[in-house]
UniProtKB/Swiss-Prot annotation:
Family: Belongs to the class-I aminoacyl-tRNA synthetase family.
Database matches in Gene3D superfamilies: Arginyl tRNA synthetase N-terminal domain, HUPs, Isoleucyl-tRNA Synthetase, Domain 1
The UniProt record lists the keyword Plastid: no
Cell compartment(s), UniProt: Cytoplasm
Subunit structure as annotated in this protein's UniProt entry: Monomer.
Keywords, ordered alphabetically: Aminoacyl-tRNA synthetase, ATP-binding, Cytoplasm, Ligase, Nucleotide-binding, Protein biosynthesis
One Gene Ontology MF term: arginine-tRNA ligase activity
Gene: argS
Protein name: Arginine--tRNA ligase
Main location: cytoplasm
Statement: the UniProt record of this protein carries the keyword Aminoacyl-tRNA synthetase: yes
InterPro entries assigned to the protein according to its UniProt record, in alphabetical order: aa-tRNA-synth_I_CS, Arg-tRNA-ligase, Arg-tRNA-synth_N, Arg-tRNA-synth_N_sf, ArgRS_core, DALR_anticod-bd, Rossmann-like_a/b/a_fold, tRNAsynth_Ia_anticodon-bd
Residue numbers covered by motif 'HIGH' region: 123-133
This protein's GO CC annotations: cytoplasm
Length: 593
């Protein structure tokens, strides 16, 4: 079931080809002047240079071939050779009926589905999430849902930061603070089972403890060589699976993951894999040996590197540092081992890394090393970077005291504002308290997510809670309000026994709504190709606006039966498509407000 833009594009291509003009020039787009036409093609201007003809002459010939197309009410030529296409009311009605009957509301799927991994979130053991994790989580979740909706087999991986020197620092800090735990770690290191049950004494350790101790330990590690050396030894003991260190580390990981899952759940974010850096630790030594066997490792002042620079690079990329001069595997080494692990377990055709754009060079270096090693084919690894969420001062968002705001606090702050906004608008006040809280939570998440996803991911934006939570303007709460309004209308229609029926298109607001519904596939395709959900967010907003104008201009329940049935069908199609779009954005719609 093609959308109108695609179907008309094929017709225009055929007309161009029949005139001896390359069909690929006949691109059809939504009209820049919707007051004059629904779609346009500027191909005659590009074709004129190619075939040596006057563009208006080409456009006239193409228009003549399109005149008999029943889908078109008119084909007109404007300016030097622009083709303006206006769709017939009957064709719009047929398209609306097809969208309304389609569970996917007119959305297609990719012709060749792929196996895809989306790496996003980026949480770390011992650290509660902060506002810096918000964009990775929101954008990554939406990209995962988008690719899944288009038909790909997709795995979302949190890529848990749970290994390395910081774990040794934490083990030492916890042991220093709790003599019983220190004694138990020593005892278990001597004669324990790393796969056994976590001792009750270890269960006393909370995420708040880890969050408090880590910055102190990190600072001391920089100042005190003996403290740093002990942390390195504890890290080595952990990586050797010494039972005391390993069981305490498991407690760190478990208590962190529980808190992280709670925060992610509040945001409507979930993962298929919670794989950590620890999951690939066993691969690193054999991988390093393999890189050496392939002649990719180069000794460099005691370190071992992979050179990734290419002829023609506009700037010099440093090599991938695989093993430090001290013999330690590095951060990029773990990333490379993760690529290898994913290839063996899932063999993805595409891995998307949703990480701050400031990490672009790091990923380019790792990806090139992976291509050299044969762990992925060129182009299978892609970093989609994003900008920062800034305060009103234009700098990355912080608390009033200048500290980093925890994500849980940001969510609660937004939920509190959502409650206030609901009360101001007189919404949900007659509902049970539990339902009101659920609605406030959905409004808060919609506010945060739409504010982020309505921007192209590469741009930064200013955090403005008052604007984000408004029920007016281009906001998540506005979209929820429009969706709930359609639900209310359809419930009322059902109570009155009103039935949906075949669509007829007569009013300008009906035309605009159907054309907007038809644009869903174009928005999905753009979002998918660019890995940029803002195209879909923009469509959801335009659809909400189009329905609002239709609702104001076209009586529904008060209309005579044939017209009422048609307009109810348009309302049903709008709701389904809007809910699908919002779900891909990770936004849930309440039943009522």
């Amino acid at each position: 079931m093609s959308d109108l833009k695609t179907a008309l594009g094929e017709a225009v291509e055929a007309a161009f080809a029949a005139e001896g003009v390359p069909a690929e020039l006949a691109r059809v787009t939504a009209s820049d002047r919707p007051d004059l036409a629904d779609f346009q093609s500027n191909g005659a201007l590009a074709a004129a240079k190619r075939v040596g003809k006057n563009p208006r002459e080409i456009a006239t010939a193409v228009a003549g071939r399109l005149q008999g197309d029943p889908r078109l009410a008119s084909v007109e030529i404007a300016g030097p050779g622009f083709l303006n296409l206006k769709v017939a009311d009957a064709a719009l009605a047929a398209r609306a009926d097809a969208i309304a009957a389609d569970p996917r509301a007119g959305a297609g799927t990719v012709p060749a589905p792929r196996r895809v991994i989306v790496d996003y979130g980026g949480p770390n053991v011992a650290k509660p999430m902060h506002v810096g994790h918000l964009r990775a989580s929101i954008i990554g979740e939406s990209v995962k849902r988008l690719y899944r909706f288009r038909g790909d087999t997709v795995i979302g991986d949190a890529h848990f930061g749970d290994w390395g020197y910081q774990m040794g620092l934490l083990i030492g800090a916890v042991c220093d603070e709790d003599a019983e735990i220190r004694a138990l770690v020593d005892q278990l290191n001597a004669s324990g089972d790393p796969n056994g049950e976590i001792p009750a004494a270890f269960e006393r350790v909370t995420l708040a403890d880890l969050d408090r101790l880590y910055p102190l330990a990190a600072a001391k590690g920089k100042e005190d060589p003996a403290y740093r050396d002990r942390a390195r030894k504890l890290t080595a003991d952990l990586q050797a699976h010494k039972p005391g260190c390993y069981l305490l580390w498991r407690r760190f990981r478990d208590v962190t993951q529980v808190a992280l899952e709670r925060d992610f759940h509040a945001l409507g974010v979930d993962f298929d894999w919670w794989k950590g850096e620890s999951d690939v630790d066993h691969l690193i030594q054999p991988m390093v040996a393999e890189l050496a066997d392939k002649g990719l490792l180069v000794d460099d002042q005691g370190a071992r590197i992979v050179r990734v620079a290419r002829e023609g690079d506009k700037r010099e990329l440093p090599p991938l540092l695989v093993v430090s001069s001290e013999g330690s595997a590095m951060y990029g080494t773990t990333d490379l081992a993760t690529i290898l692990d994913r290839k063996r377990e899932f063999d993805p055709q595409l891995v998307i890394y949703c990480v701050d754009q400031r990490q672009a060079d790091h990923f380019e270096i790792v990806f090139r090393a992976a291509y050299l090693a044969g762990y992925a084919e060129e182009g299978q690894l892609e970093h989609i970077g994003f900008g920062t969420m800034n305060g009103t001062d234009g700098k990355p968002f912080k608390t009033r005291e200048g500290g980093v705001l925890k994500l849980a606090d940001l969510i609660e702050m937004t939920r509190s504002k959502a409650r206030e906004r609901l009360h101001e608008a007189g919404l949900g006040e007659d509902l049970p308290a539990e339902e009101f809280e659920d609605i406030a939570g959905k409004v808060a998440v919609a506010a945060l997510k739409f504010a982020d996803l309505s921007n192209f991911r590469g741009t930064s934006y200013v955090f403005d809670l008052d604007r984000f939570t408004s029920f007016e303007g281009k906001t998540g709460p506005y979209l929820l309000y429009q969706a709930v309004r359609v639900k209310s209308l359809l419930r009322k229609a059902e109570a009155e026994g009103a039935q949906a029926g075949p669509v007829t298109v007569a009013e300008p607001a009906e035309r605009d709504l159907v054309l907007t519904l038809d644009a869903f596939e174009t928005a999905l395709q753009e979002a998918y190709d660019k890995k940029a959900p803002n195209a879909l967010a923009e469509h959801a907003y335009r659809l909400s606006q189009a329905f609002s104008k239709f609702y104001a201009a076209c009586p529904i329940l008060a209309a005579p039966p044939p017209v009422r049935g048609s307009r109810l069908t348009l309302a049903q199609a709008t709701l389904r498509q809007l809910e699908l779009a919002l779900d891909i954005l990770g936004i849930a719609v309440p039943e009522r407000m």
